[in-house]
Design a protein with these regions (language model features):
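Transmembrane beta-strands of outer-membrane beta-barrel pores
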Residues: 49-55, 81-83, 92-98, 133-139, ...
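Outer-membrane beta-barrel "beta-signal"
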Residues: 300-314
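Residues on the lipid-exposed face of transmembrane beta-strands in outer-membrane beta-barrel proteins
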Residues: 45, 49-51, 71-79, 113-119, ...
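Transmembrane beta-strands of outer-membrane beta-barrel proteins
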Residues: 43-47, 86-90, 127-131, 162, ...
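Short loop/turn motifs that connect adjacent beta-strands in outer-membrane beta-barrel proteins
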Residues: 32-41, 78-86, 120-128, 175-178, ...
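Sec-dependent signal peptide cleavage junction
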Residues: 17-46
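Outer-membrane pore/translocation modules
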Residues: 106-214, 295
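Extracellular loop and loop/strand-boundary signature of outer-membrane beta-barrel proteins
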Residues: 58-63, 97-103, 148-154, 201-207, ...
Length: 314
C-alpha cells in the first residue's frame, strides 16, 4: 500500500513539473510575441473632409449663399528596434470658401513633414536628430473687395522652412515628448521673386533665403485613451515649437503652437477643432485700427478651424 502511495505521489510530481514547464514556456512565448509586437514599423493616419453650405432664395432676412470645403490628412510611420527610435509624420491641410458672387478663396494651406531619429542614451532620454520641412501648396492673396483687386502674399516655397536640429529627446511615456536642441540650423526660403524683392518673411530685399543658427524646443502631448465616459471618443493633440536665433535678437522667440481636438461620433463621422498660433518678429502684417490698416508690424497670428464631416482612420 505504501509503495502504491509513493508511486502515485511520484507520478503527480512529474505531471505537475511537466505542466509547470509548459506554462512557463507558454508565458515566455507570449512575452516574446508581445515584445516583438512593439518592435519594427508602425504606420497609420487619419483623413478628414468637412463641408458646409448655405443656400438662400428670396430670403427676407438677407444673407449670402456660401460653400466651404476643408480637407486634412495626417499620417505617420514610426520605427522602433532595441534602443533605436525613428519617428516620421506628414500633415497636409487645404480649405476653400466661396461666398456670394466672389470666387473661391483659400482658408487653409499646410504642408508639414517631420522626421526624428533617436538612440537611447539613458532611461527616457534619447540622443536625437530632427528634420522639419514646412511650406504651402498654392498661392495666397490679400483681397480688396471694394477695389476688386488681390495682392499675392504667399506661394509654394514662399515661404518654405527647413530646420535641422541636434539634441536630447525626453520621452517618459507614449503620450508626451520634449525635444531640446541647443544646436539648430534654420533656413527660410522665399522663391517667388515678387515676394523676395519685397523682403517678405524676413529675407533681405532681393535675396531668396535667410539662414539662422540657434536653439530649438519641440514639445508634443497626445492622448486618445481617456478613461472618462464623456471623453472616450476624444483625441487630443497639442504641440509647440520654439526657436531662438543666437546671432540676432535671441530674446525674440519664434512660436508655433498647434492644437487638434477630434470628437469621434461613429466610424466615419467626426467633429474637429484645429487651432494654430504663430509669432515671428520677422513676419510683418498690417496693424488694423478702427477698420483701417495704419501700420505694418509683428503681431500674434491665430487661426481656428471648426468642422464636422467625414473621417477615416487607417
Amino acid at each position: 500500500m505504501r509503495r502504491i502511495f509513493f508511486t502515485i505521489v511520484l507520478l503527480l510530481s512529474v505531471f505537475n513539473m511537466t505542466i509547470y514547464s509548459q506554462v512557463t514556456d507558454a508565458e515566455k512565448t507570449l512575452r516574446t510575441k508581445l515584445a516583438d509586437s512593439t518592435q519594427g514599423w508602425k504606420r497609420g493616419g487619419v483623413f478628414a473632409l468637412n463641408l458646409a453650405q448655405t443656400s438662400l432664395t428670396n430670403w427676407a432676412a438677407g444673407g449670402q449663399n456660401s460653400f466651404a470645403v476643408n480637407g486634412m490628412l495626417s499620417t505617420f510611420a514610426n520605427y522602433k528596434r532595441g534602443k533605436t527610435v525613428w519617428v516620421n509624420s506628414l500633415d497636409l491641410g487645404y480649405g476653400l470658401l466661396k461666398q456670394g458672387n466672389l470666387g473661391y478663396r483659400k482658408t487653409d494651406d499646410k504642408f508639414d513633414f517631420l522626421s526624428k531619429y533617436g538612440h537611447e542614451a539613458f532611461k527616457n532620454f534619447y540622443y536625437a536628430a530632427l528634420f522639419n520641412f514646412k511650406t504651402q501648396m498654392a498661392p495666397g492673396y490679400k483681397y480688396d473687395d471694394a477695389a476688386k483687386t488681390k495682392d499675392l502674399i504667399s506661394d509654394l516655397f514662399s515661404p518654405a522652412y527647413f530646420l535641422l536640429a541636434l539634441g536630447l529627446d525626453y520621452k517618459p511615456s507614449d503620450h508626451f515628448s520634449a525635444f531640446i536642441a541647443p544646436v539648430t540650423g534654420k533656413i527660410t526660403v522665399v522663391s517667388n521673386k515678387t515676394l523676395s524683392d519685397a523682403g517678405a518673411f524676413g529675407v533681405k530685399p532681393g535675396e531668396k533665403s535667410l539662414s539662422e543658427f540657434g536653439g530649438y524646443l519641440r514639445a508634443i502631448y497626445t492622448k486618445n485613451d481617456f478613461k472618462s465616459e464623456f471623453l472616450k471618443n476624444v483625441t487630443f493633440t497639442t504641440k509647440i515649437d520654439l526657436f531662438s536665433n543666437y546671432v540676432k535678437n535671441p530674446q525674440n522667440i519664434v512660436v508655433n503652437w498647434e492644437t487638434l481636438i477630434a470628437f469621434k461620433v461613429n466610424k466615419f463621422i467626426s467633429a474637429n477643432i484645429n487651432t494654430q498660433l504663430i509669432y515671428d518678429d520677422k513676419i510683418k502684417v498690417p496693424v488694423v485700427r478702427n477698420g483701417e490698416a495704419t501700420a505694418i508690424g509683428s503681431l500674434v497670428q491665430f487661426k481656428e478651424i471648426l468642422g464636422v464631416g467625414f473621417s477615416y482612420n487607417f
